[in-house]
From Swiss-Prot:
GO terms for molecular function: rRNA binding; structural constituent of ribosome. GO terms for cellular component: ribonucleoprotein complex; ribosome. Belongs to the bacterial ribosomal protein bL20 family. This is Large ribosomal subunit protein bL20. InterPro entries: Ribosomal_bL20, RIBOSOMAL_L20_CS, Ribosomal_protein_bL20_C. Keywords: Ribonucleoprotein, Ribosomal protein, RNA-binding, rRNA-binding. It comes from the Bacteria. SUPFAM superfamilies: Ribosomal protein L20. GO terms for biological process: ribosomal large subunit assembly; translation. Binds directly to 23S ribosomal RNA and is necessary for the in vitro assembly process of the 50S ribosomal subunit. It is not involved in the protein synthesizing functions of that subunit. It comes from Colwellia psychrerythraea (strain 34H / ATCC BAA-681) (Vibrio psychroerythus). PROSITE patterns: RIBOSOMAL_L20. The gene is rplT. PANTHER family: 39S RIBOSOMAL PROTEIN L20.
């Protein structure tokens, strides 16, 4: 049986990792062992941050909605509760967009929420 040598596969694997590490500083882009660690860690950060991005955007939307609602004399929690009672189903992303770019429409929504809370 012939001896199996893995030089070709090793070279390909090393090239793949070094290609992924392109643009990294110093040994992180040149030395396979260091580059492998850097690429692995980068993958872990990317995986974690794809999930964190969703949380961070929701936090941003809530902060914007809260600021706009308070300018109209209503807290965030009461505003959201009022919208639910008024059967207005607009998600936080769209509400934040309305709060930033269309203040008149947001004021209208706040009035609807206040009316449903009073009723």
């Amino acid at each position: 049986m012939a001896r199996v040598k893995r030089g070709v596969q090793a070279r390909a694997r090393h090239k793949k990792v070094l290609k992924q590490a392109k643009g990294y500083y110093g040994a992180r882009s040149r030395v396979y062992r260091v580059a492998y660690q850097a690429v692995t860690k980068a993958g872990q950060y990317a995986y974690r941050d794809r999930r964190q991005r969703k949380r961070q955007f929701r936090q941003l939307w809530i902060a914007r909605i809260n600021a706009a609602a308070r300018q109209n004399g209503l807290s965030y929690s009461k505003f959201i509760n009022g919208l639910k009672k008024a059967s207005i189903e607009i998600d936080r992303k769209i509400l934040a967009d309305i709060a930033v770019y269309d203040k008149a429409a947001f004021t209208f929504l706040v009035e609807k929420a206040q009316a449903s809370l009073a009723a």
